[in-house]
From Swiss-Prot:
Entry annotated with the keyword Glycosyltransferase: yes
Protein name (record): Nicotinate-nucleotide pyrophosphorylase [carboxylating], chloroplastic
Function: Involved in the catabolism of quinolinic acid (QA).
A Pfam cross-reference name: QRPTase_C
Family: Belongs to the NadC/ModD family.
Protein localization: Plastid, Chloroplast
Pathways per UniProt: Cofactor biosynthesis; NAD(+) biosynthesis; nicotinate D-ribonucleotide from quinolinate: step 1/1
Chemical reaction(s) catalysed: nicotinate beta-D-ribonucleotide + CO2 + diphosphate = quinolinate + 5-phospho-alpha-D-ribose 1-diphosphate + 2 H(+)
Listed SUPFAM superfamilies: Nicotinate/Quinolinate PRTase C-terminal domain-like, Nicotinate/Quinolinate PRTase N-terminal domain-like
GO molecular function, one term: nicotinate-nucleotide diphosphorylase (carboxylating) activity
Keyword annotations of the record: Chloroplast, Glycosyltransferase, Plastid, Pyridine nucleotide biosynthesis, Transferase, Transit peptide
Transit peptide boundaries: 1-48
UniProt EC number: 2.4.2.19
Organism from which the protein derives: Oryza sativa subsp. japonica (Rice)
Length: 371
């Protein structure tokens, strides 16, 4: 390619670029001698990917969204940490040319998630950092397992550390609970809801996919979902469905349509409307048809009756009173999907740490007369 053409080539949108304001807040040290103890340890401690024994997995891509910018989310997370001065603790204690190696350690059992996002964050902070993973997103890790390492400028590793861990711990917590619920609910599929952390919608939903769940609607734009308030304002479930069909036909939109039902009578009314009209209805939500009992068990008889009434004509979704203890019994009713807001609104982060190699740090201290 001629030089002029190469210069005119647009930037790759998939390559993360460090925001100009952030660039001055991280360190980019000059190259170091290949004979240094750090380069030797790099060769010893970071095996080539071909020699790793991690379970191979096809990477799980984040959900698609027309306006959500994952790069901007990463930049925001870094900016709120860096402020207008950068990491003053690192600036005070660590020379800019010091290299270090840090290890990711699982502090408890669970499903790891956020590895792909961590790669993006490290690249955003310092493209020269070398990152190696011994596990993949979606793999099960045990307490004490070292599942990844990062090597390079010590300051920049520490700048990235908390942002990487905040995302990874949250995503791993979501993925761990999703995996447990998905396994218990089979053959029904587990869905999350829109009850996600503000600004982290795609990150939370990405973690659900990594954990083996499926995504409900991403936002208000990709599915028509008629809930109790819509039904109340529209004057009933039949009127609401009629208005939806008219709207989609007028706007020439082909979108999935879900309607929330709370009683068997509402299910019957909806089925009667669907039998008499050319409708866009695709899924019926069966809300709070799982009834808690005083002994800790649940009564799913109403849910079973609703599933039998629908008889496969539409997808079904159970919602309400869904927990890790109840999801198996709910899944046995024959519903297509089970949705749980708790997957993302009540997540317990998985404990993960990133530790700099102590022996390496002591060598740095001796070399800089700081030990």
């Amino acid at each position: 390619m001629p030089a002029a053409a190469a210069a005119a080539a647009p930037p790759n949108p998939n390559v993360l670029q460090l925001a100009p304001r952030l660039r001055g807040l991280v360190s980019f040290p000059s190259s170091y001698s290949s004979s240094s103890p750090f380069s030797n340890r790099l060769r010893l401690r970071l095996p080539r990917a071909a020699s790793m024994s991690a379970e191979a997995r096809v990477p799980v891509a984040p959900p698609a969204h027309p306006t959500y910018d994952l790069k901007a989310v990463i930049n925001l997370a870094l900016s709120e940490d860096a402020g207008d001065r950068g990491d003053v603790s690192c600036l005070a204690t660590i020379p800019s040319d010091v290299k270090a190696e840090a290890t990711f350690i699982a502090k408890e059992d669970g499903v790891v998630a956020g590895i792909s996002l961590a790669d993006m964050i490290f690249k955003q902070v310092d493209p020269s950092l070398k990152v190696e993973w011994f596990e993949s997103d979606g793999n099960y890790v045990h307490k004490g397992l070292q599942f990844g390492r990062v090597y390079g400028c010590a300051r920049n590793i520490i700048v990235a550390e908390r942002v990487v861990l905040n995302f990874m711990q949250r995503m791993s917590g979501i993925a761990t609970m999703t995996k447990a619920m998905a396994d218990a609910a089979h053959p029904a599929c587990i869905l999350e809801t829109r009850k996600t952390a503000p600004g982290l919608r795609l990150v939370d939903k990405w973690a659900v996919l990594i954990g083996g769940g499926k995504n409900h609607r991403i936002g208000l734009f990709d599915m028509v979902m008629i809930k109790d308030n819509h039904i109340s304002v529209a004057g009933g479930i039949t009127n609401a469905m009629k208005f939806v069909d008219r709207f989609l036909a007028k706007e020439k939109l082909a979108l999935p349509v879900e309607v929330e039902t709370r009683t068997l009578q509402e299910v019957k009314d909806l089925l009667e409307y669907a039998a008499e009209n050319n409708t866009s209805l695709t899924r019926i939500m069966l809300d709070n048809m799982v009834v808690p009992l005083g002994n800790g068990d649940i009564d799913v008889s109403m849910l079973k009756d609703a599933v039998e009434l629908i008889n496969g004509r539409f997808e079904t979704e159970a919602s309400g009173n869904v927990t890790i203890d109840t999801v198996k019994k709910i899944g046995e009713t024959g519903v297509t999907y089970i949705s749980s807001g708790a997957l993302t609104h009540s997540v317990k982060a998985l404990d993960i740490s990133l530790k700099i190699d102590t022996e390496l740090a002591l060598q740095v201290g001796r070399r800089t007369n700081r030990a």
